Amino acid sequence: MSTFYVPAINLIGRGVVNEIGSYVKDLGYNKALLVTDKFIQSSEILPKVTKPLDEAGIDYVVFSDVEPNPTCKNVTDGVSALKENNCDFIISLGGGSPQDAASCISVIATNGGKPQDYEGLHKSAKKGLPVVAINTTAGTSAEITINYVITDEERKVKMVMVDKNSLALISVNDPELMVSKPAPLTAATGMDALTHAVEALVTPGAYGVTKKLSIGAIELIKEYLPRAVKDGHDIEAREGMVNAIFLGGMSFNNAGLGYVHSMAHQLGAVYKLPHGVCCAMLLPVIERENAKRVPAAFRDVAKALGLDPAGKTDEECAAYAIKEIETLSETVGIPKKLTELGIEEKDFDFEYLSKNALIDACAPGNPFMPTLEETIAFYKELF
């Protein structure tokens, strides 16, 4: 038997953010903690969300102290703000960082404790406080998944939480909220979405439904990501990417991820690098190794990226898929080496990051479990 998790209500398409007030009112909630970041708080996006809330008579208080790669302190401060203002539900507004912070705030609000208590698989006992998750980037799919990531500042580790009790009640994916996103952010989040779809397709946890979802996501990303990066106001491309992340999010939410994410989490935790960029740089490195172990799994990846696999060997399909991934990454402007991001090999703590990657919650989803030495070698390929 396979369990399939997805929010109960999912609003997708142009202008759907205008409907949130009526949905919240019908559900009987009164006051929201609106979790976001400083950029969105000062942008044109926030009024597009607060306007329908005001019209529906829904009260809210804005909590914008969420950093990129949200920390334990961000979460505990959010929990304090929620309690001080007597909020009975949460609205998360943003990309992966506000979404992840809101998920952890939700779980702690009903279960108590601290973020570290929930690292790992399904550690909470009670359903979290209701969350209306409004996404503003086409990448993480955090608005529809049971996964969230919080950085432990003291240990310099990204803690991966997989918890069905953190699942949002309502997800909102409105492409009109994404047109102002700059090209580098669009590229990074889009490559994160591609990583989700590819990892979910080749993981041993993949099954019929999730495989179809991953394939659809990969096809859409190849078609629409370059367009969205080239012209952020290409609303058709933005809508295509919204559809891609919804499909890919449903896939990895239920099939799992792999070692690309395990290694990328460490780069973000220690060096505060953009998660999507880290995933994009690592994706061909890890999938090249995965293809040696499970080459047949890459026939679907290659087909989704444009190859007719008829008459081709598994190895030929895998080589094509990895080359296409590298080409797409280059097309949208992703750096190839960590030195381009200001990280020098002589300063890189290979053993520390590699040891943490091996115990990351995403690692068991990979087609094979690398050794410490192999992981160090993978990181060395980024220099």
Question: What are the language-model segments listed below?
Answer:
Residues D308-F383:
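C-terminal charged capping/lid subdomain of soluble metabolic enzymes
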Residues Q41-Q116, R227-R238:
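N-terminal small/polar loop signature for handling phosphorylated ligands or for N-terminal nucleophile
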Residues V17-I20, S42-I45, C72-K73, S97-S103, ...:
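Short glycine/serine/threonine-rich phosphate/pyrophosphate-binding segments
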Residues N18, T110-A206, A297-D300, A304:
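A glycine/threonine-rich phosphate-anchoring loop and its flanking beta-alpha core
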Residues L33-L34, F89-I91, V132:
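Conserved beta-strand elements of the Class I
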Residues M1-F63:
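An N-terminal, well-structured beta->alpha segment
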Residues A200-T327:
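Active-site segments that bind and position negatively charged phosphate/pyrophosphate groups
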